[in-house]
């Protein structure tokens, strides 16, 4: 696996769970001898929904809800076979979407 990079993108609604998962990945990669670049915080995607407060009248009375999707980016430079094995066995928290590109 010479001169290859592993790019890991993480997404979650809760930034604390996301940061803990990122920390676990970084610690695992460093423990196996790989060099880690990041975590790089990517822009938070905010999706807003506007609904009427009343089901019948009062169009001017509305309520807004939002979902925030937090994202992080990690690059693992020159991973060893032990790094890949350790990352495959890593058990991350529920609610974190992991996307890996080699």
UniProtKB/Swiss-Prot annotation:
Annotated signal peptide: none
GO terms of molecular function: structural constituent of ribosome; tRNA binding
Keyword tags: Ribonucleoprotein, Ribosomal protein
One cellular-component annotation, GO: ribosome
GO biological process: translation
Keyword Ribosomal protein: yes
Binding partners and assembly: Part of the 30S ribosomal subunit.
General function of this protein: Involved in the binding of tRNA to the ribosomes.
Similarity-based family: Belongs to the universal ribosomal protein uS10 family.
Protein name, entry field: Small ribosomal subunit protein uS10
Gene: rpsJ
